[in-house]
UniProtKB/Swiss-Prot annotation:
Record GO terms (molecular function): nickel cation binding; superoxide dismutase activity
Domain of life: Bacteria
Enzyme Commission (EC) number: 1.15.1.1
Required co-factors: Ni(2+)
Name this polypeptide is given: Superoxide dismutase [Ni]
Alphabetically ordered keywords of this record: Antioxidant, Cytoplasm, Metal-binding, Nickel, Oxidoreductase
Tagged with keyword Amino-acid biosynthesis: no
Length: 131
């Protein structure tokens, strides 16, 4: 009797672990903007303590950006999106690799490269939201 009481009445499915529906590449972009801004600040400040703190924060922000891209890739984008945008797998992969390069560098160009890839992913994301 209890099993019938607690049995689901309606079967539902979700695209992620929790069907919140809140996805946005802006999260990755903001973290990547932080990476680039930190790289620029590092170039203008040679204080050792600042450099160490900036390096730690830059690496954390790059990891967060990579995480947000991974969530988009694994939870938001679905097979129909990859069929419509066959370059999407490569774009996400290149963006993540660019963020890894930015972690290992103080050159703002590496941060900008990650931002450029994220901008392309953002464009595709919003096109899929219109569909």
């Amino acid at each position: 009797m209890l099993s019938r009481l607690f049995a689901p009445k309606v079967k539902v499915s979700a695209h992620c672990d929790l069907p919140c529906g809140v996805y946005d590449p802006a999260q990755a972009r903001i973290e990547a903007e932080s990476v680039k801004a930190i790289q620029e600040k590092m170039a203008a400040n040679d204080d050792l303590h600042f450099q160490i703190r900036a390096t730690v924060i830059k690496e954390q922000r790059a990891e967060l950006a990579k995480h947000h891209l991974d969530v988009l890739w694994s939870d938001y984008f679905k097979p129909p999106h990859f069929e419509s945008y066959p370059e999407l797998h490569t774009l996400v992969n290149e963006a993540v690799k660019a963020l890894s390069a930015a972690k290992a560098s103080t050159d703002p160009a590496t941060g900008q490269k990650a931002l450029d890839y994220i901008a392309q992913i953002d464009k595709i994301f919003w096109e899929t939201k219109k569909a």
